[in-house]
């Protein structure tokens, strides 16, 4: 029976080690992807000052510290589990989720992140404008009404309604004047 418990413990420890290693690998991959995308965004933001970049790097350093604290917490809880304490898998998940949120806050709170995000939004709006122009050009080429054509027709319709109302008002005044004289 003792051998069986020892084997169960060995299997449990091996499974826990594999789970921790897989979680750590996913964490490192996620962190690497985040840093790469963040640095790419910084490179694409030409107006960024040295001070802003420095602040952004400090934010990243704080985020890295959060990640390292999470790794330390996870190691401590894994050690507790190996010593027999009942530690749920949810606790490990929560350590990483909370740390991820905190780390992202550290980076997202920097002016470098704001500048990079602003540049990304500006680029997206520019791309949308270009796509809209291409769509309008295609519609025009195919003989369909474009947004500009529809806007022009709407403006003309409003002007016609305004003029019609003015003519009706004058006509009413003429009819009223004829009734008074007659």
UniProtKB/Swiss-Prot annotation:
GO biological process, one term: poly(3-hydroxyalkanoate) biosynthetic process
E.C. number(s) listed in UniProt: 2.3.1.-
Record keyword Cell membrane present: no
One Gene Ontology MF term: acyltransferase activity
Disruption phenotype: Depletion of both phaC and phaE genes leads to complete loss of PHA synthase activity and PHBV production.
Pathways involved: Biopolymer metabolism; poly-(R)-3-hydroxybutanoate biosynthesis
Biotech use: PHB and PHBV are desirable bioplastic due to their biodegradability, biocompatibility, and mechanical properties. However, PHBV has better mechanical properties than PHB.
UniProt keyword annotations, A-Z: Acyltransferase, PHA biosynthesis, PHB biosynthesis, Plasmid, Transferase
Biological role: Involved in the production of polyhydroxyalkonic acids (PHAs), which are water-insoluble biopolymers used as intracellular energy reserve material when cells grow under conditions of nutrient limitation. PHAs are composed primarily of 3-hydroxybutyric acid (3HB) and 3-hydroxyvaleric acid (3HV). Required for the production of poly-beta-hydroxybutyrate (PHB) and poly(beta-hydroxybutyrate-co-beta-hydroxyvalerate) (PHBV).
Homology family: Belongs to the PHA/PHB synthase family.
Oligomeric and partner information: Heterodimer with PhaC.
Protein name per the record: Poly(3-hydroxyalkanoate) polymerase subunit PhaE
Organism name: Haloferax mediterranei (strain ATCC 33500 / DSM 1411 / JCM 8866 / NBRC 14739 / NCIMB 2177 / R-4)
């Amino acid at each position: 029976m003792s051998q069986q418990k020892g084997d169960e413990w060995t299997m449990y420890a091996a499974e826990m080690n594999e789970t921790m290693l897989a979680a750590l690998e996913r964490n490192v991959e996620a962190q690497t992807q985040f840093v790469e995308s963040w640095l790419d965004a910084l490179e694409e933001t030409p107006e960024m000052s040295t001070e802003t970049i420095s602040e952004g790097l400090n934010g990243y350093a704080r985020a890295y510290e959060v990640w390292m604290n999470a790794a330390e917490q996870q190691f401590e809880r894994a050690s507790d589990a190996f010593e027999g304490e009942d530690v749920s898998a949810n606790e490990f998940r929560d350590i990483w989720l909370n740390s991820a949120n905190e780390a992202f806050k550290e980076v997202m709170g920097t002016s470098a992140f704001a500048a990079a995000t602003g540049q990304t939004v500006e680029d997206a709006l520019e791309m949308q404008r270009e796509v809209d122009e291409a769509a309008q050009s295609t519609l025009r080429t195919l003989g369909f009404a474009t947004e500009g054509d529809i806007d022009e027709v709407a403006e003309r319709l409003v002007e016609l309604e305004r003029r019609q109302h003015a003519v009706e008002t004058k006509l009413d005044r003429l009819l009223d004047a004829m009734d008074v004289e007659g």
